[in-house]
Amino acid sequence: MAKKSLILLYGGRSAEREVSVLSAESVMRAINYDLFSVKTYFITKEGDFIKTQEFSSKPAEDVRLMTNDTVDMSRKIKPSDIYEEGAVVFPVLHGPMGEDGSIQGFLEVLKMPYVGCNILSSSLAMDKITTKRVLESAGIAQVPYVALVDGEDLEQKIQEIEEKLSYPVFTKPSNMGSSVGISKSDNQEELRASLDLAFKYDSRVLVEQGVTAREIEVGLLGNADVKSSLPGEVVKDVAFYDYQAKYIDNKITMAIPAQLPEGVVNTMRQNAEIAFRAIGGLGLSRCDFFYTEDGQVFLNELNTMPGFTQWSMYPLLWENMGLAYPDLIEKLVALAEEAFAKREAHLL
């Protein structure tokens, strides 16, 4: 049987491009090369598409993908040159211009099947404020928050924050991920600094009530028939799970499955599936929850292209469910082809 061609897109223009490289290298090593041949394309921080390595067998451990530090601009191509009939694209891209609907729209114009959520669900879930409003309408509990838009009366919004919330609070760019631009504030002075930081990344900012809680994550896999994994827990060695701790220092460990009451597990899995359907999710997502000391469950966020690094929660959650990393990739490709066939049929 002829191998299927799988195209990995990685890098990208967002602040999370380094995470994308780590994820792509992990996927590259986990692929079943009896079933797939692999082509990789690097998107630079300027948005150029670079044709990089091809693999017909598992690469050696010392093989590294091209990055912004090693980029060879002589291999630059037109973005549309990635098109290959019958190939499936795995956009291992995180953050804006990656999992926000941009690349998904590009791939739909090219008429190529791709792994993961479509334009609408990707763009919706990428924006924290919009996601919160959609999940509110679905009846899912979330922590109290205040939304800010650049240009609004800052003093009035700070007054609203201090009336509705209590310190500590967390300030987040609405349209970022991987803890980029997120900071904790224990007083108004720190809040002002946090708002300045968040507005550097986005024109819309979310301020959330800080809660003392365990951080629990649930994997989602499927299209209309989405299934959820047993939860896993992020166990931190630092007070705040920021970008530095999450990806660079690796100061976290994970408990899979998380030790939780059965009723809490069921609530989280049910809410994760409801949330996935509420945004119109396809393929995969990771749903993150807070579980407080007094037993409350709050949905924190949906991540439509979770990390795929060797220490990322999402593939480990499915491994715990009996689905090995190579089989997970095979399943995601099959789901991509299923979604593509339905999308094309609706357009005919």
Curated annotation (Swiss-Prot):
Pfam families per record: Dala_Dala_lig_C, Dala_Dala_lig_N
Primary location group: cytoplasm
Domain of life: Bacteria
EC number of this enzyme: 6.3.2.4
Chemical reaction(s) catalysed: 2 D-alanine + ATP = D-alanyl-D-alanine + ADP + phosphate + H(+)
Annotated residues for binding of ATP: 162-217
The ATP-grasp domain, residue ranges: 132-334
Binding site residues for Mg(2+) 1: 288, 301
Pathway(s): Cell wall biogenesis; peptidoglycan biosynthesis
Cofactor: Mg(2+); Mn(2+)
UniProt protein name: D-alanine--D-alanine ligase
Naturally occurring in which organism (per UniProt): Streptococcus gordonii (strain Challis / ATCC 35105 / BCRC 15272 / CH1 / DL1 / V288)
